[in-house]
Regions:
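Glycine-rich beta->alpha junctions and the first turn(s) of the following alpha-helix
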Residues: 1-85, 155, 194-203
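Catalytic-loop motifs flanking and including active-site residues across diverse enzymes
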Residues: 51, 80-83, 108, 163-169
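C-terminal helix-coil-helix/basic helical segment that borders enzyme active sites and/or dimer interfaces
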Residues: 68-71, 82-140
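A glycine-rich phosphate-binding loop feature that marks nucleotide/adenosyl-phosphate handling sites
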Residues: 73-76, 109-111, 187-191
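Generic, well-ordered alpha-helical scaffold segments in large soluble proteins
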Residues: 22, 54-58, 62, 73, ...
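Hydrophobic alpha-helical scaffolding
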Residues: 9, 45, 102, 109, ...
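Acidic/polar loop patches that form or flank catalytic/metal-binding clefts of enzymes
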Residues: 6-9, 124, 179-182
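Glycine-rich phosphate/cofactor-binding loops in nucleotide/flavin-utilizing enzymes
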Residues: 15-35, 131-203
């Protein structure tokens, strides 16, 4: 398929720059700092935005809101929620006024991914057996907790894995030296690859 020249995004032969910009926007969106998302937008909510009440609803539905361990878990989920909101605000303002590089979106992306995983673990613990068994066809808080736990890795992959975010933070935000790589500054077409396995003799 051939496209006309006016369909090119960015400069010809400079697609990597466009791809990096796209990934940066994706990281910002997944991290909760973009107004152009359909999911939760911590930036728009502000410091006093709506709280995540799913953990509280769970303990109340199971009648364990007086349990000391359950209350500690609910408090942990609340702290993660408040910390994320403050982090998104600070990083977004920093990128806007130039005090932080645009790649700083990796900070909110990484925190969002790790805190989301932890909050799904908390909801699973609070739901107990309700997270693995429920009346057929019914949408319950326990079912939601169980299904969210099974999907918990999604946020760690969208916009780049946690390991990639740590590399971005280290190299492009903190200015630390890059890891050594044998193929650095080598055109992709010249990067050495593993040889294709040969078929066994007589196959």
């Amino acid at each position: 398929m051939r496209l006309p020249p006016d369909s090119v995004v960015g400069d010809v032969n400079d697609g990597w720059t466009v791809a990096l910009a796209l990934l940066g926007h994706e990281r910002n969106a997944v991290g909760g700092g973009s107004p152009y998302v359909s999911g939760r937008n911590y930036l728009a909510e502000g410091a006093d935005g709506a709280r995540d009440l799913s953990s509280i609803a769970l303990v109340r539905s199971r009648g364990i809101d007086g349990d000391a361990v359950a209350r500690q878990l609910v408090a942990e989920a609340h702290v993660l929620d408040v910390a994320q909101r403050g982090l998104v605000q600070r990083v977004t303002v920093g990128m806007g006024n130039g005090k932080l590089a645009g790649q700083a979106a990796a900070i909110t992306k990484l925190f969002t991914a790790t805190s989301a995983e932890r909050k799904t673990e908390i909801r699973l613990a609070l739901a107990g057996t309700d997270a693995v068994t429920w009346p057929a066809g019914e949408e319950t808080l326990g079912r939601e907790a169980g299904e969210s736990f099974l999907e918990r890795q999604a946020t760690s992959l969208a916009g780049g894995s946690n390991e990639i975010q740590r590399n971005i933070i280290a190299e492009r935000v903190l200015g630390m030296p890059r890891e050594w790589a044998a193929d650095r500054d080598v055109p992709f077409r010249d990067v050495r690859r593993n040889a294709m396995p040969t078929a066994p003799s007589g196959a």
